[in-house]
Amino acid sequence: EYGLYVIGETNLETHGTWQKLGADGSDEWTLPGARPEWRENVLARTDAMLERDKNHPAILIWSCGNESHGGKTLWEMSEYFRNTDPSRLVHYEGIFWNREYPATSDMESQMYTPVADIKKFLAEHPEKPFIMCEYSHAMGNSCGGITDYTEYAYEEPLYQGGFIWEYMDHGIAVTSPDGKPGFAYGGDFGDRPTDREFCVDGLVLPDRRNTPKMDAVKAAYAPLKITLTDTEAVIENRNLFTDLNAYDLVFASSVNGKPERRAVLRADCKPGGTEHIPFPFALPEAGLACMTVTAIQRAALPGIPAGYEAALGQVWHNYAVARLTLPAPQLVEMDCNVGVKGEGFEYIFGRGKGLVSIRYNGVQLLDDTVRPNFWRAPTNNDEGCAEPFTFAFWKTAGLYARCDNLSAETKGDFVIARANYTLPDGQTLPIDFAIDGAGRCDITMTWQGTRTELPEFGLLFPLRRELTEVSYLGLGPRE
């Protein structure tokens, strides 16, 4: 009724035996492995699940379990599925770690493999289709890179998609001492040792309220891909059975976040097809101009009300900051500093520090030196992988980056100041500041290092405390 494809997985997980004390894959401890004393118990679970669920048409595939390594017993499970119900395929991820019985699974399956490594694996192992039985761990601030995986499913026929771990947070409803409702997890009850928030790893909260992660998933899983140029919407119908005419296509323009014009169109496009639809009106050439196209469900479906926004596409143009035809600002070179001056503004670069001052209309904007930054607050997933320890170098790399060389020159309508930074491990980072006659500054950072696992890549601008107001267009009310 809801159009879900399901893998029915046996209630079997023994990752504590093959990850004993962090040592993966030791047959000495692995269960069930090939131990005869576990065979009857494991096959009983297999039979119980199959008999319970065999008449559910949503189940396309049976799974032997999760994170239980490999061995003969798991292969016998897979054969039981095939012999009892030959209409369905069999899945098991553990054969990636233990190739002793590769026929256990009818498909290749892995967890949390980067897309680049999936491509490499499929180039070397094209014999079976491939799924990611877990590809995004939805704990804390996460799910930011899922489109790398979902888009690859449309590029590579062997790559059949994957599963997010997991749907919901597992927390216990509690009331705090000050009377506020909330959710508790491991460690909140004095339990030691504890896995803390490791079961709070879902797309929705324990009471099923959505999180911003669900918005990211909705966009990645949208039945339509809407790409906008300056003059038209290119709509790829990714539905398997539904025509594009099941949606109202709403074209809406805005300037600086304020609505301007709106039109509703309909178009025909068969499943799997692509339609090019010209804009019904031009994008305004003023301010921060945006064209948004949304696909709105016309008729209610099971679980989907009429009026539901199924997909969205946007294109932006910032006409508010279109370059003025002004001469380059004045470049002033001194022994210790380099200045860039124009009408109402000035920048000062310290030869051993980088950008130290920005003044607009006589007001100093900076409270300290602008510096590169490679660190951010660790997420729950970072902490689960011990990445704060692994990547701690990057915190000090930004704090103690050294500006070894500063050069400046006038090029056309710009003054370009280049600050060359050296990081504590000897890697270099050039940063170019291109300043025009209106005081606008375009910044280009070029990473030249060999290390690629940067937690963040950007600049910190310490602003004066009296600068208390900021105006911006963000990613929406839920971000």
Each language-model region and where it sits:
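Extended substrate-binding grooves/exosites of carbohydrate-active enzymes
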Residues: 1-231, 239-245, 250-259
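Terminal connector regions
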Residues: 283-323
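Short beta-strand elements of extracellular/lumenal beta-sandwich folds
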Residues: 230-239, 442-448
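Beta-strand/loop-rich accessory regions of lumenal/periplasmic or secreted enzymes
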Residues: 280-286, 318-479
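Generic detection of short hydrophobic beta-strand segments and adjacent strand-loop junctions
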Residues: 262-269, 275-281, 310-319, 459-461
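Solvent-exposed strand-loop boundary residues in beta-sheet-rich modules
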Residues: 255-257, 299-301, 361-362, 465
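Extracellular ectodomain segments of secreted/surface proteins
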Residues: 218-231, 314-330
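Beta-strand-rich binding/interaction modules
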Residues: 232-267, 275-280, 287-298
